[in-house]
């Protein structure tokens, strides 16, 4: 397991980011994450494992869309189905939201592999992009 570090809201490791305790409970923090990741990819697919996480799904997707990027959403989907489907939409980044208690956001490249440490470090150190 490779621990990369933390920013205000997330701990970054192994192709995912996990919310720090007491953070990312509101939509504005999740939208900020969406604006941040929008600067690194062109087309996104975002999904969540159950309806408990839809507010985070919508907020991240909103942040991405604010920056003029395409985002496809999958509500209430299992990870294998999500990983199979998003490359068919030509998405170059997959965002999967899961977790009980803390939010875990798994990030995948266009080939269904977890994002590399270099990209995660860039996300961790980057600030939110400007809306289009």
Q: What residue ranges belong to the model's regions?
A:
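An N-terminal, well-structured beta->alpha segment
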Residues: 1-67
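A short, terminal or domain-edge coil/loop segment
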Residues: 24, 94-102, 124-132
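Generic alpha-helical secondary structure signal
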Residues: 28, 80, 118-121
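Ferredoxin-reductase
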Residues: 42-111
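Ser/Thr/Gly-rich flexible loops in soluble cytosolic domains mediating phosphotransfer, phosphorylation
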Residues: 110-132
């Amino acid at each position: 397991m490779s621990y990369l570090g933390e920013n205000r809201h997330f701990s970054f490791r192994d192709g995912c980011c996990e919310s720090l305790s007491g953070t990312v409970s509101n939509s504005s923090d999740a939208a900020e994450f969406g604006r941040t990741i929008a600067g690194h990819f062109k087309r996104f697919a975002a999904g969540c494992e159950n309806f408990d996480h839809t507010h985070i799904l919508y907020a991240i997707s909103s942040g991405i869309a604010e920056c003029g990027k395409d985002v496809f959403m999958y509500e209430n989907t299992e990870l294998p189905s999500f990983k199979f489907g998003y490359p068919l939409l030509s998405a170059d980044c997959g965002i999967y939201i899961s977790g009980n208690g803390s939010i875990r956001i798994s990030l995948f490249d266009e080939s269904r592999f977890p994002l590399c440490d270099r990209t995660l470090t860039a996300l961790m150190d980057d600030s939110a992009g400007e809306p289009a």
